[in-house]
Amino acid sequence: MSEASARIIIDKLLMESGWILPGSNSKVNVDAELTNESGRADYVLMDSKGFPLCIIEAKRGLKSPLDGKEQARGYADALNCRFVLLSNGIQHYQWDLEKGSPFVIDQFPTQSQLQLRQEKFNPSIDEDEDVSNDY
């Protein structure tokens, strides 16, 4: 399977998870082939405010998706993304750069699932605490 064939499957999985690809009449939340100083990311998934949330690195079917791990980490670091998806169209991995190793997934996460994971990791401070007294 070529990388182009893998991308067709990835596009389908993204749409099934509610992501909006370029060419749609709706507000797009996926950027395909975004180029930055680290190179070209195959896909960048955006959060609801339009900021990069997740990188997808696509490999052709005969290669392990994990072969793109360090390449994807470089793109994620350059775009300040915490999440990476690695796929060859057959196998798919999700990687939370803050929590450890990639793990196998059957479907891609939704925008709201990734945003919720991001927010749980970076909770906002909602309470004022009096720290004037010694303990």
Describe each PLM feature range.
Residues 1-54, 59-135:
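ATP-dependent helicase/translocase motor core
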